[in-house]
Amino acid sequence: MNDYLIKAINASKDLRLLTINGKDLVAEAQKRHDTWSASSAVLGRSLLGTLLLAGAELKGDQELTLRLLGDGPVGAAVVTAKSDLTVKGYVQNNHVALPAREDGHIDVKKAVGKGWLQVTKDLGLKQPYTGEVPIVSGEIAEDLTYYLAKSEQIPSAVGLSVFVNPNDTIGAAGGFLLQALPGASEELLQETEDRIKALPQLSSAFLDGMTPEDLAKKILGDDCKILEKDEVSYHCDCSKEKYAGMLETLKGSQLKEMIDEDHGAELVCNFCGNKYNFTEAELQAILDKKLGK
């Protein structure tokens, strides 16, 4: 498997780490949405970050949605990941490319802007739970770190990186989520923080062939233990049946307008771009069902 996430623990079992290589899934998203460089970086980092949160927190049939509601040119980013580590997402504006920063990297901070980061968890309870924090950086990894500290009170460090080639294809995509467990000493936390600061630029390292296992050893040390290795992928579960169900929630007058004026309907999935066409007869059947005919 090319795209996968690993869960690891350090030798003293007081640091938990998830690392991910997600080049292919980010490339799939880029192709589906035809995103340009800045949009790809925002979407790619959001996909990776949401998968890391899902890997750390979800089980069973649970799912988690990240909403990055910035006022930058890319607009909002919406990403949903499930406990099986499938993910889907989109940004409001696909065709955004910005002048590079002085160091040559994509200006993700400018692309995102100011606003709010929301994380909604559907844990199978009566109501989903949403945590919200202001966007403090716009680089996304720092914003997720802030969210985990403020909303969930978990000392964490997040790193995310997406390398976009000059032709807008994806060259590399990966990242990590480190969490301190109860009992972790200040000395250990400082030592680990120093290791993270000494890491090579993530996208360059992934381009050079670094694996999630390599990254885990760089952060936790060679004596860390790999607990799990799971495939991650881009997958949208949309279907014509689901969209028919959505049409059933419309007012009868709206359906009648689609039949009489548009002579059908075409619905496009935000997450994957798939198009679903409904004929006049199909819309009439939905309307009849709604009216109890």
Curated annotation (Swiss-Prot):
Alphabetically ordered keywords of this record: Chaperone, Cytoplasm, Disulfide bond, Redox-active center, Stress response, Zinc
Pfam families: HSP33 (PF01430)
BP-aspect Gene Ontology terms: protein refolding
The keyword Chaperone belongs to this UniProt entry's keyword annotation: yes
Leader sequence residues: none
InterPro entries hit by this protein: Heat_shock_Hsp33 (IPR000397), Heat_shock_Hsp33_C (IPR016154), Heat_shock_Hsp33_N (IPR016153)
Modifications made to the protein after synthesis: Under oxidizing conditions two disulfide bonds are formed involving the reactive cysteines. Under reducing conditions zinc is bound to the reactive cysteines and the protein is inactive.
Gene Ontology molecular-function annotations: protein folding chaperone; unfolded protein binding
Subcellular location, principal: cytoplasm
Cross-referenced CDD domains: Hsp33
One GO cellular component term: cytoplasm
Subcellular location(s) per record: Cytoplasm
Cystine connections: 236-238, 269-272
HAMAP family assigned to the protein according to its UniProt record, in alphabetical order: HslO
Function: Redox regulated molecular chaperone. Protects both thermally unfolding and oxidatively damaged proteins from irreversible aggregation. Plays an important role in the bacterial defense system toward oxidative stress.
Family the entry assigns: Belongs to the HSP33 family.
Record's protein name: 33 kDa chaperonin
Taxonomic lineage of the native organism: Bacteria, Bacillati, Bacillota, Bacilli, Lactobacillales
